[in-house]
Amino acid sequence: MRTNELILYKDMEDGELLQDMTFLMENYNNEYYNEDDMKSLLYSTIGDLTELSVSHGFEGNLWHTYLTYLMVSHENAYSTSCEIVGPVEGSINIAALHDFKIFKELFDYDFQNLGEVLGEDGLAMIRDYKGVNGHGQVFNERIRDRICDLAKALDGTKCAEEFKEKVTQFYKEFGVGKLGLHKAFRIEHTEEGARIVPITKIAHVHLDDLVGYEMAKKKLIDNTEAFVMGRKSNNCLLFGDAGTGKSSSIKAILNQYYDQGLRMIEVYKHQFQDLNDVIAQIKNRNYKFIIYMDDLSFEEFEIEYKYLKAVIEGGLEKKPDNVLIYATSNRRHLIRETFKDKEDRDEELHTNDTVQEKLSLVARFGVTIYFGRPQKREFQEIVCQLAKRNNLNLTEEELLAEANKWELSHGGMSGRTAQQFIDYLAGKTGNFSEI
């Protein structure tokens, strides 16, 4: 089936299954091979295909979906050139069309003769597979559905050129590989360096879900929108009291601008040594990346802030235009200052240098946004709006009376406290006297 002639789409992850299946296609009727061994390989391959499909949540024609999955997952010179921007000019199209002709042949392969020789049972199953629970562990339903829809569209193509056009359109709309198919990522440190790993389950929070803080949200939106649109933008620090919606606002920003090419990588301060490696992996991709640091703060003895300052400020190499850093913190100045610091400054000749070194990290964030605790009237408004969204059948007087009792024993007034109160009410069936 000419898979050994692929130019761009080679050395694919999960490609062993393709090698086994094409070997069967080419040799199922070859007398040189033992028929029982060939049957064993066929059912082993069908088993591997089924396992992969269950883990990814695939349904329908598993062979078509598997081939589609290979194409949308493989990062090569053609696919990464087309992500977000669409069709490109140049000789790379010749190599791409060559490979898509081979994939088209694989799509159109008729398994009937192979099934008559080696057995039809397993092949019938993979032609119209029904999933167990409708979702997988690797992809969320949104990604799974896009891949399955593309597989169906490719099944209807009449030529390799049309086949290539549909795959390229997918690259433009949704991207390619893990950075294209997923919204959010975390970092794993390996012996080879930093590895970017997709986060498949993320909160589906949206900015409209966050009650209040309109000025703060607008400032965050304006900066992020400028970044996504390729205009000048700044690193952003969201600071203020706990439970006021800082982290939720960041997650909401990702959900709002994902379709415009925004991606987010969560990094913890013990991973700051990997930041340069991470940036090197993403700087040439056609996406906009926010490196997200939640609850960022440093004790007086911690020096990781120096790594962060160096990355933000940059050395000889300019920080890529497609990377920003967003952080949340309960501290305005990020680094805790103690009375000992003041005593040390009394003994140090260059007192101002010591102060500036510790405070200069905040200056690296061009946009700072304050999220303060709501006043009583604002807190009550948040409670009322959340109650309305959850269809709670209490009068406003009853609701606010219970909310006041709740906040006194649950950390004071904040958006988080209001949400926890509403979640508590929504979980009860009638009696609210035990709050």
Each model region followed by its residue ranges:
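N-terminal pre-Walker A segment at the start of P-loop NTPase domains
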Residues: 199-225
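Conserved catalytic/switch belt of AAA+ P-loop NTPases
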Residues: 299-349, 353
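Walker A/P-loop
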Residues: 235-265, 277-284
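Conserved nucleotide-sensing/catalytic segment adjacent to the nucleotide-binding pocket
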Residues: 263-265, 276-320
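Conserved AAA+ ATPase "SRH/arginine-finger" region at the nucleotide-binding site
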Residues: 346-359, 366-380
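C-terminal alpha-helical "lid" subdomain
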Residues: 368, 372-435
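Intrinsically disordered, low-complexity N-terminal extensions of AAA+/P-loop NTPases
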Residues: 1-153
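Interdomain "pre-motor" coupling segment immediately N-terminal to P-loop NTPase/helicase cores
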Residues: 133-196
